[in-house]
Regions:
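A solvent-exposed interaction/effector surface
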Residues: 1-158
Length: 158
């Protein structure tokens, strides 16, 4: 695996989120563009870090039942329209690598991290969620569909 992997200790992070149920890939991209981004703009949240959490493995769970949470950092006491769900992403050590590509390419990047890097790292997954982290400066090109994010897996010693 040629991707640079960094170990990052993330703090617990309060978020507001909306859940998409259905296939991953282009439907999730549409969910962000049609539902989440307008809500973020309405609530003046566009300059914040965002997270994506895919809860299910579509090779095990029927794609129509796969769950994905589109999250934005938000303090619990912030008043937000649209009735978002709230939670705190658990803190801890994550192995992260920068992704730059299209929705169709992101699965291969996950596989390189999980199947290529992790087995030789001296670490193992723990029970916290796998994350796509979208830093404030992350780019998205609507013409090409190319976007940037950090893909992050929760790790602990073997």
């Amino acid at each position: 695996m040629n991707d640079k992997v960094s170990l990052i200790d993330m703090p617990a992070t309060p978020v507001a989120y909306f859940r998409h149920v259905g296939p991953y890939g282009p439907p999730v991209a549409r969910f962000w563009m049609e539902r989440v981004a307008p809500w973020m703009e309405e609530n003046k949240l566009l300059g914040r870090v965002r997270y994506g959490i895919a809860h299910d493995d579509p090779t095990i769970t029927e794609p129509a039942k796969c769950r994905y949470d589109a999250c934005v950092v938000a303090e619990p006491k912030e008043v937000l329209s649209g009735s978002p769900l709230r939670t705190a992403l658990p803190g801890g050590r994550y192995a992260c690598t920068r992704f730059h590509g299209t929705v169709d390419e992101v699965d291969a990047a996950w596989q390189r991290l999980l199947g290529g890097w992790l087995p030789t790292s001296g670490l193992q997954l723990d029970a916290r969620p796998l994350l796509e982290r979208y830093p404030v400066e992350a780019k998205y090109d609507p013409q090409t569909g190319i976007f940037e994010c950090d893909i992050c897996i929760p790790v602990k010693p073997l």
